[in-house]
From Swiss-Prot:
Enzyme Commission number(s): 5.3.1.9
Keyword Isomerase: yes
Coiled coil: none
Protein name as catalogued: Glucose-6-phosphate isomerase
Gene name in the database record: pgi
BP GO terms, sorted: gluconeogenesis; glucose 6-phosphate metabolic process; glycolytic process
Locations listed in the record: Cytoplasm
Record-stated family: Belongs to the GPI family.
């Protein structure tokens, strides 16, 4: 592929907004003017559907829900006064609570001022807050944030070890919309045990962020937790960053949540425009559509040339892949939509997978993210009368040019600096692009049925494990093969899973399962020792 580049084409397709401090350059995507003309009618329909969505239409038909993350930064757009007031009151409560913590009016049980925040959640309830907490962290932060976002026991131990003796001064936020998410429940129970082993009352350090009336909400009220903040059924986890899910921890950290909300609100205003060339969200979605030909399957490599945006790729990975990775369209037809997102940061990635991008399969497009401001204050010159920041930009421009020469497509998003406002802009920009792309290809971007399949299968694996342990304990000292165990518990069709579960059981001490290693390994025998008489 020969990519057409010229100063004229660059100027023709450059989106620039001085107030947003945002530039979007799509000129190195090899689309034609006819492409935009051909998509004009589908885009008009998409704009109409977006209007209906923001007015409260059931944009998530499979779950019968409205989609209202746009209302979080502009409550006056909410379809009812009740929703608008709930959003406004929740934000006020968040800011009031943060002020009480910062002032010391609200302290831990032993009079310890809170200095740390520990967030426990999974998926969208953690990825967004963690990204922004890292992107906007500074030496002026009022509290230090820690995160437990996985069910890995060793990972939990590592986080708690880093907190160490600061646990009495650590406020714990438990985030779960339903209150029944297994990973979050397990994380909460692990953390609760840590507080109790330290002689501390967990409820005196705990805050719930959950849907009203959920299991978690009821638990927090029963035990008298410090506070509970709401999640709403019209906000999905991956778009919940600007609700209490993200705003509470960020306000506690000392981050400018007003700036974050304003940036998102202002960007939303631009991405509502029905003029496609004046709408950065529409342009971004159209480039995805062009690259995938509306069929999905293409890879998006995200390269932010800024350490503060390193976690942005992980955030986008969930936002885009969980939203757009769908087997069926809205008509029930099999389409297997999706865009694979990966990346880390420039210029590190130039020394990892750039080789393949330049000479391997042409099955991707690159999204460069450029930040113009290098640092607070001035920089020293390295060599060639150039600062390290100037070298970093040169690496971005050089990589982009090399890709173009090899016929590999890219687009570039530029912001002036990383601050709360521009982070809000970026979040809103990609949220809108996801919505528009989903409308163009006719899929539901707001559910995740396959994730539920995985949860169901995990529950079945736990039940299978329990059946294995029960079988072995009924026959102490008797050595069973995998086949014999599977036969005994009626799971002959799942011998591989039985074997995998047994390997884990024998590596950990809790159930007392032992292995007499066989050759080959799957021929091993398993047993539980009986009592020593």
């Amino acid at each position: 592929m020969v990519i057409i580049t010229s100063w004229k084409r660059f100027k023709e397709y450059l989106y620039y907004d001085q107030e947003l401090e945002l530039l979007l350059d799509i000129s190195r995507m090899n689309f034609s003017a006819e492409f935009l003309t051909e998509l004009a009618e589908p885009m008009r329909d998409a704009y109409h559907q977006l209007q209906l969505l923001e007015k409260g239409a059931l944009a998530n038909p499979d779950e019968g829900r409205m989609v209202g993350h746009y209302w979080l930064r502009n409550p006056d757009l909410a379809p009812t006064e009740e929703i608008a007031q709930d959003i406004k009151e929740t934000l006020k409560e968040i800011l009031d609570f943060a002020e009480q913590i910062h002032s010391g009016r609200l302290q831990g049980e032993k009079g310890n001022p809170f200095r740390n925040i520990l967030l426990v959640g999974v998926g969208g309830s953690i990825l967004g807050p963690r990204f922004v907490a890292d992107a906007l962290a500074s030496s002026r932060d009022k509290m230090k944030a820690f995160f437990i976002d996985n069910g890995d026991p060793d990972g939990i131990d590592r986080v708690l070890s880093r907190i160490g003796e600061e646990l009495p001064a650590t406020l714990c936020l438990i985030i779960s919309k339903s209150g029944g998410t297994i990973e979050t429940r397990n994380g909460m129970l692990e953390v609760r045990r840590a507080y109790e082993e330290a002689g501390l009352s967990f409820p005196d350090h705990a805050v719930a962020i959950t849907q009203r009336g959920s299991q978690l909400d009821k638990l927090s009220q029963k035990e008298g937790w410090l506070r509970a903040f709401p999640m709403w059924d019209w906000v999905g986890g991956r778009t919940s960053l600007l609700s209490a899910v993200g705003l509470l921890s960020l306000a506690l950290q000392g981050i400018d949540v007003a700036g974050l909300l304003q940036g998102a609100k202002d960007c939303d205003g631009r991405t509502r425009r029905p003029d496609t060339l004046a709408n950065p969200g529409a342009l971004l979605a159209l480039m995805w559509y062009y690259s995938t030909q509306g069929q999905g399957g293409k890879q998006m490599v995200v390269l932010p040339y800024k350490d503060r945006l390193e976690l942005f790729t992980k955030y986008l990975q969930q936002l885009i892949m969980e939203s757009l990775g769908k087997e069926k369209n809205l008509q029930g037809e099999t389409v297997h939509q999706g865009i694979t997102v990966y990346g880390n940061k420039g210029s590190s990635d130039q020394h990892s997978y750039l080789q393949q991008l330049l000479e391997g399969p042409d099955n991707f497009f690159v999204t460069f993210i450029e930040v113009l401001k290098d640092r607070q204050g001035s920089s020293a010159y390295m060599e060639e009368n150039s600062t390290s920041g100037e070298y970093l930009q040169a690496f971005l421009l050089g990589t982009r040019e090399a890709l173009t020469q090899k016929g590999r497509e890219s687009l570039t998003i530029t912001v002036k600096e990383v601050n709360a406002y521009t982070i809000g802009v970026l979040i809103a920009l990609f949220e809108r692009a996801v919505s528009i792309y989903a409308l163009l290809v006719g899929i539901n971007a707001y559910h995740q049925p396959a994730v539920e399949m995985g949860k169901k299968a995990a529950g079945q694996a736990i039940q299978l494990k329990n059946n294995i342990v029960e079988c072995l304990k009924k026959h102490p000292d008797k050595r069973f093969s995998v086949h014999e165990i599977a036969l005994a518990i009626g799971e002959e069709a799942h011998q591989e899973m039985v074997f995998k579960l047994l390997l884990h059981l024998t590596t950990n001490p809790e159930h007392g399962v032992n292995m007499a290693a066989g050759h080959p390994l799957p021929e091993s025998r398993f047993f539980v020792s009986g009592p020593i008489l």
